Amino acid sequence: MRHEQARQAAAQPQGRYVLPNIIEKTSRGEYGMDPYSKLLKERIVFLGVQIDDVSANDVMAQLLFLESEDPDRDISIYINSPGGSFTSLTAIYDTMQFVRPDISTICMGQAASAAAVLLAAGTPGKRFALENSRILIHQPSAQGEGQSSDIEIQAREILRMRSLLERMLAVHTGKKEEDIRKDIERDKIFSADEAKEYGLIDEVIKTRKSSRLATAR
């Protein structure tokens, strides 16, 4: 029975590949690091998961660390995320506006919901998407439960969050809030070129060499 359970466990799909350990050689010897730490050394923050309190804290900590290391050198945020919590979005968003360095945002794969706002919130002229990226915006949502007074409170909060989302997107796309309000009524999906036309990004890129991304860092 134990062997059968072990066999079934081994047959289950794995959530991720095993990350390789990168060996760095310096004058002081060799030391290992994971790819995310290596990227951080290059001032790259990689957001490749759902946006929740844990991932938001990770991103915020990295932004603050990189600012302390060099407040005048750009930071890059690479995004491949389905979105997530609105409060976690605002935490990262406010930190992006708070720190001194310019922040370049790059969509690789998808930037949906909260992640699309972070993509648009990069420094003007330094917001990019790879050519087959998918970007999605929509209104905030929440599940209401409890007494009628509780549901009423939650409904007011949803309206407040929606108003804030509309204002954020209007600021970073140059569109009017009423136009944003109509567009997020339902899921609105963009190709990379459509996202550029809408004002969510500044450039669609195929390679680093052929884009402003080469000089944005």
Curated annotation (Swiss-Prot):
Q: Name one GO cellular component term.
A: cytoplasm
What GO MF terms are annotated?
ATP-dependent peptidase activity; ATPase binding; serine-type endopeptidase activity
Active site location: 113 (nucleophile), 138
What coarse category fits the chief subcellular location reported for this protein? cytoplasm
Query: What Enzyme Commission number does this protein have?
Result: 3.4.21.92
Which domain of life does the protein's organism represent? Answer: Bacteria
Keyword Nucleotidyltransferase attributed = no
Q: SUPFAM superfamilies in the record, alphabetically? A: ClpP/crotonase
UniProt keyword terms in alphabetical order: Cytoplasm, Hydrolase, Protease, Serine protease
Catalyzed reactions:
Hydrolysis of proteins to small peptides in the presence of ATP and magnesium. alpha-casein is the usual test substrate. In the absence of ATP, only oligopeptides shorter than five residues are hydrolyzed (such as succinyl-Leu-Tyr-|-NHMec, and Leu-Tyr-Leu-|-Tyr-Trp, in which cleavage of the -Tyr-|-Leu- and -Tyr-|-Trp bonds also occurs)
Q: Where in the cell is it found?
A: Cytoplasm
On subunit structure and binding partners, the annotation says:
Fourteen ClpP subunits assemble into 2 heptameric rings which stack back to back to give a disk-like structure with a central cavity, resembling the structure of eukaryotic proteasomes.
Q: What does this protein do?
A: Cleaves peptides in various proteins in a process that requires ATP hydrolysis. Has a chymotrypsin-like activity. Plays a major role in the degradation of misfolded proteins.
Q: Which family does it belong to?
A: Belongs to the peptidase S14 family.
User: What protein am I looking at?
Assistant: ATP-dependent Clp protease proteolytic subunit 2
